[in-house]
């Protein structure tokens, strides 16, 4: 969880059958620029610092999930990522707009599978997450 997706730097670990299928059928890897490679090396050299950031993400993710689950109108999905996905059902457009009015940026995903009103909130700083949770509380009571 080094947060380097924007650089198109990542990896996956899987069995040979899956990696062969992935490489030959689904997607070829992106070529890496020198800047991307240097950023990856720098991130690995700072892994202790990154582990601290991961701990903060885990703590804040748990707090967001627990708070969102207090609202019957939300279906909150378990997460191990640096974001939380939840279905706000028919009120997702209203929730998205109300948060946007307060300068809180989340992702409106809409329909995913059988879920009609999916929203995604990235895990930020404790202060950012508190602002998000307060806005939700003010909106839904």
PLM region descriptions:
Residues 77, 108-109:
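Beta-hairpin "wing" of winged helix-turn-helix
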Residues 29, 83, 113:
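Residue-level detector of flexible, active-site-proximal loop/helix-junction positions
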Residues 1-69, 74-77:
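PLP-dependent aminotransferase class I/II
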Residues 98-102, 111-141:
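PLP-dependent enzyme catalytic core of the Aspartate aminotransferase-like
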Residues 57-58, 68-102, 125:
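Conserved PLP-binding catalytic core of the aspartate aminotransferase-like
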Residues 32, 106-108:
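Hydrophobic residues in well-ordered beta-strands that form the structural core
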Residues 6, 80, 113-117:
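Short acidic/glycine-enriched loop/turn segments that link adjacent beta-strands
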């Amino acid at each position: 969880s080094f947060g380097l997706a924007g650089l198109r730097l990542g990896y996956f670990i899987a069995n040979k059958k899956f990696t062969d299928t992935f490489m030959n059928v689904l997607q070829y890897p992106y070529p890496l620029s020198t800047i991307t490679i240097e950023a990856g090396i720098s991130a690995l050299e700072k892994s202790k610092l990154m582990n601290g950031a991961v701990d903060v993400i885990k703590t804040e993710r748990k707090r967001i999930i627990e708070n969102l689950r207090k609202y019957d109108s939300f279906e909150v999905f378990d997460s191990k990522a640096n974001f939380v996905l939840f279905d706000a059902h028919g009120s997702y457009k209203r929730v998205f707009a109300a948060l946007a009015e307060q300068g809180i940026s989340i992702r409106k995903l809409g329909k995913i599978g059988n879920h009609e009103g999916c929203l995604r909130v990235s895990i930020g700083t404790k202060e950012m997450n508190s602002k998000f949770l307060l806005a939700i509380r003010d909106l839904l009571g």
